[in-house]
């Protein structure tokens, strides 16, 4: 009740924050005259002065006004660009660990230099995170002269970079790179076999460009390092032959069946489910194909893998469409990012879905993979001491930024007021009517000589629009994931008079459409241009620029609404940069996917009530409100999915922290001899307790079993039965002491043979390998647990609580297994005298060979089961590990040494 009145009196929280920061802006401006008077050398010397003042106890906040003034003056001298006052507010927002929402053309890259310079003074490093390698390299090289003028070093990290070059990049004051590369390097560091192999320092401060893309759109995409799993390509091909024989079961709203079939599709949740008839039919077909034994159920425990393949095939055929969710290029399935319209090379779908699509498209089927290490962007970026970001569209997701990352969103006022006119949506009954109206709007704008940008949601729609324009004889350019190599050239001239560009939401980010075209691109196309040529190009551009402004600026036409309001706002934001005129209009039809799935009934009834005829459009605030409500519904659902995935991953994340802390402590330790001694005692106590229960009678002791376990786990044969027969005073406690003494003596002899230093090095390498191998198996087990845990809901149990309880139990088992397997391997190993330096060099070579065969790619975030709000076969970043070509035994076969253990848990650890 009083909220509107209070807001009117005191302003919104955002307005109050801006007012607060304007006071600091005044202080920065007061320094300007003093900075102008400094020579280049004196200005550069300010960096050393600031570092000295920090060392003496001053804080970054105290340095901020003068440091910002130094950065602004350096920007003027080096880049020819002076930070506006609103850009100073943006810099303060980033420094305070918030998200700065700035409109297109407001100079986000320049804003970043203020907070980056200030925080780099601490010497702890600053990471500038971008969405792709091109932007990382472009921004780093663009701003490098400014930072180097101020005495700071700049590094760029990228995939396939030589290790020494990458370490140097991370050691720089400021490091540019992509979110994927920073995340993968974190995982690589936690698989290193020595401190020298690590890349990253402490995760101090990160500035994320296009922060909504990385922290929201990419939040469901795990980063995974993986090893190759068994080959199932033949099974995918067989299943792919069967799927087209299944038909869809369709029911009307009243429950009337209009088409009997085998499966149903839920478009809202993007799920496909077999019905009873479908189960029976697929079981019969699998039996005929020899894939399922006669009379067996597809739901038998040992057939669940086959069921997964069937569902992967169904999803591939019914939910994933070529030129919509993916394209086929050079014999590979390339996924399309629904948010940017760009392809995502290297990113693969999980749970066999990518292989099923490859089978559907008759491509070579790549092997599945097994997870070795993983994290999510949500958990990785929360590791930074301070996090901030910039984007043109964050306010609609402010709640999520605050609730998950603890980041507040600050809307930075524009340097010039917005002059763009955003028209109401026009809604038509059919898609054909909508496209006809779009063509008419294009013709009208082109008569005036206005540049037009037509935004589409998919490649399919962009190509359909292109075909319609060709029939009309209208010249245009198409920008989508198929023609991405022409992006720079197309965008450079998209603002020229009469230019018509059809684009997917590729054109929504990292691009500025300049009215009149881009004169700098024209100059760059010339070989050794003269001053006269440059002046002429500028003069011609100025005329074109003025001509476009007089006709009304860039007109943006959208062929449909996206699920996210942010993407719609990004498309609108291409027009009206820095106070330029412009306009935007969305054209919709009841056949659009968003309208059909989420908003059509209400709007359709409204249109019927108005008695609308074919070709007529409705332009009403009620319709726009209904669409926005539908978008909010989708955004809310997607937020629930991301939040749910985070809640599950938080469980794994706590375990990940423990394992990585243990691993880093091992790497940092010079000698882990005491750790091994402690492990040996704990494993021995546990082994004895299995066969001699505490406080039990001798008649209850399993002596034969204990002797066998000691031979298996400690590689030592001890006559325990004989000892007991010969010594009446040997009871439980003294027996434990005697066994520990015997085992310790045997290991001491091994130390004498191998040499103390060599064995200590070997112990560390073995413990690291055991830890990595068991952690990999644990991740796989956790993955299986997560996929099936939703079924506990049917037993009236809370799936999340059940997952936490079971994962804790699995983690306790993991910690015990690490100790047990390490001691088993060290006990069984046969040592020979070797020069310590040679031993260390050999182990290092083996570790490097292991690392060199790892693959790093993006796959898809695993779902949480179809009953939950999730997307199975979502994307995920994956990397693969080595497979030994000379390995004669299978990893799950009994070890050759006779221990009775699987090869992977015995001598497979050493080899």
Swiss-Prot record:
May bind 1 zinc ion per subunit. ATP binds at residues 87, 105-109, 512. One of its GO terms (cellular component) is cytosol. SUPFAM superfamilies: Helical scaffold and wing domains of SecA, P-loop containing nucleoside triphosphate hydrolases, Pre-protein crosslinking domain of SecA. Its cofactor is Zn(2+). Zn(2+) binds at residues 895, 897, 906-907. It is an enzyme of class 7 (translocase). InterPro entries: Helicase_ATP-bd (IPR014001), Helicase_C-like (IPR001650), P-loop_NTPase (IPR027417), SEC_C_motif (IPR004027), SecA (IPR000185), SecA_DEAD (IPR011115), SecA_motor_DEAD (IPR014018), SecA_preprotein_X-link_dom (IPR011130). The keyword ATP-binding applies. PROSITE patterns: SECA_MOTOR_DEAD (PS51196). CDD domains: DEXDc_SecA, SF2_C_secA. Its main location: membrane. It catalyses: ATP + H2O + cellular proteinSide 1 = ADP + phosphate + cellular proteinSide 2. One of its GO terms (molecular function) is protein-exporting ATPase activity. Keywords: ATP-binding, Cell inner membrane, Cell membrane, Cytoplasm, Membrane, Metal-binding, Nucleotide-binding, Protein transport, Translocase, Translocation, Transport, Zinc. It is found in: Cell inner membrane; Cytoplasm. Part of the Sec protein translocase complex. Interacts with the SecYEG preprotein conducting channel. Has a central role in coupling the hydrolysis of ATP to the transfer of proteins into and across the cell membrane, serving both as a receptor for the preprotein-SecB complex and as an ATP-driven molecular motor driving the stepwise translocation of polypeptide chains across the membrane. PANTHER family: CHLOROPLAST PROTEIN-TRANSPORTING ATPASE (PTHR30612:SF0), SECA INNER MEMBRANE COMPONENT OF SEC PROTEIN SECRETION SYSTEM (PTHR30612). Belongs to the SecA family. This is Protein translocase subunit SecA. It comes from Pseudomonas putida (strain ATCC 47054 / DSM 6125 / CFBP 8728 / NCIMB 11950 / KT2440). The gene is secA.
